[in-house]
């Protein structure tokens, strides 16, 4: 991949270029900039912005790391403070319009609902962050549910939260599976289109 080939995937000012596994599906309207590392079978939806371009004191840009089979839906914004990183664990779903601002670390199989926001936060595995919830400078233990619209800023507020139910965990898995199938379907459609174009060139 080069910046000339893909205008939506490009270098930052430090010269870092995204590392994207070929099995990942990146919508053409998404913007992937700088020191971004996208692992296998990731889905990046329309109008998402993933931008790693803020240099730390050492002059380097810390990475935004998106692990295997993560779902990034439409309009998600991922960025970080100078020298800070964002890490998203495998099979996590980040829903429409969510904002992740590093430093933050998200574990495996989490569910970050629509319009939720994170800043300087850590989510262990299987955490549910509800619609429009805001989390700042806190750590959520595994299987915690943050209700829709909650604003969580300290440890006492975290400790007051309940754990997700089995029904909620099943829902998280269903949302991830549906979007994973969507990635597969779009890739198959792209491969068919490329095959048709290739055949047309040969015939021409």
Identify the residue ranges that each predicted region occupies:
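Glycine/small-residue-rich phosphate/adenosyl-binding loop
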Residues: 71
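Conserved short histidine dyad/triad with adjacent acidic residue
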Residues: 21, 26
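Glycine-rich hexapeptide-repeat left-handed beta-helix
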Residues: 2-19, 47, 51-53, 57-65, ...
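Core nucleotidyl-transferase/polymerase catalytic module
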Residues: 91
